[in-house]
């Protein structure tokens, strides 16, 4: 996602793609530490759900996904549904927190493995899913 006026086109194209029945994968991590599994999420990607609701009248689900390359697995967790009646700032926080909590819980429940972090850091600094030290 671009951080200038192109973001509007990105959101519009995303909504069009969703309306066409496509699934969208969003990787919302930023370079701010959160825990040993994830970096914090940028929140504004949730605005796609608001725009989608305005266009379709349907609430969008965000499906938490955890990639565990060392285990050769992709895990999908319980969907988190956008609430169009809630203030958007509140929904951004709620959805991001629910996604981060769900992904973290999924990762921690798995056998010990190396977590491939969002930031480009040396492999020697990679943590495991059972580490107590945050990524950043």
Residue ranges and their predicted role:
Residues 1-5:
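Short, flexible loop segments at the rims of nucleotide/cofactor-binding pockets, characterized by
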